[in-house]
Amino acid sequence: MHIPVLVEEVIEYLNPQPGENFVDGTCGAAGHTLAILEKNYPDGKVMCFDWDSESLDRAKKIVGDKEGNLLERTIFINDSYANLKKNTVENNFGPINGILVDLGFSSDQLGASGRGFSFLKDEPLDMRYSQSNDLPAREIINHWQKDEIEKIIKEYGEEPWARKISEAIVSFRKVKTILTTKELLNVIAAAIPQKLQHARIHFATRTFQALRIAVNDELGNLQRFLPAAVDVLSDGGRLAVISFHSLEDRIVKNFFREQVKAEQGKILTKKPIIAGEAEIQVNPRSRSAKLRVFKKA
């Protein structure tokens, strides 16, 4: 079961009040959405985005199983948060008092998704959140040039062995098309020295992360989302972003600084908010989470 991170901190900074409207750009298992709905009762609404239709269906069930009018106060959108403005306009949703995105990867998707998000299960190399996306991971692995593969593994995965891994991929695919997570895992293992394969972070983690980011254009979506979020926010509205790796955090930090320079608002978190030891004990993945919050002028 996916456990949402930094829920208390998110609620503290978004400060939902009765009747206010919010956007949860990454619905997942609806953990943050439910926390907001508890605070903006009785008639505040949440617009809840998820590009993954399976995740959105799970969220609908979770919200629907709760007592009260939560389901009728939630608008579910099967789309990327990058298309925030389009969807808020089409649904005449507003005024918007706060927006949240949690850029972490849902642990529910690491289960038997059948889409190859995890190297712990042997599944087809797909990694698409949405089937409307026409770039599965196998396309990158089997058809992109070596330099292109090396670039995404190095930049998106921050993997020091990116060159060796990309060389191994290109060498292996000449013999056999790489179609499953297990096949890719074996190729990565062949490229990394044995002595480095028992580190705290699994040796395939960075490569799989890089592929997932590339397949779903995660950094591009974030860069499109941020200005749209500030645009649709009401004056005094708050934008909260939870990131899990340095690439995302850098984009958010720099964007917030640019907004301050342009006198569009102020940063409420001088330093990113991180999880306390108690939360990390219950949910180890929260160790990597960083929350930054911006308030529109």
Where are these regions (language model features)?
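S-adenosyl-L-methionine-dependent methyltransferase catalytic core, i.e., the SAM/SAH-binding region
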Residues: M1-A297
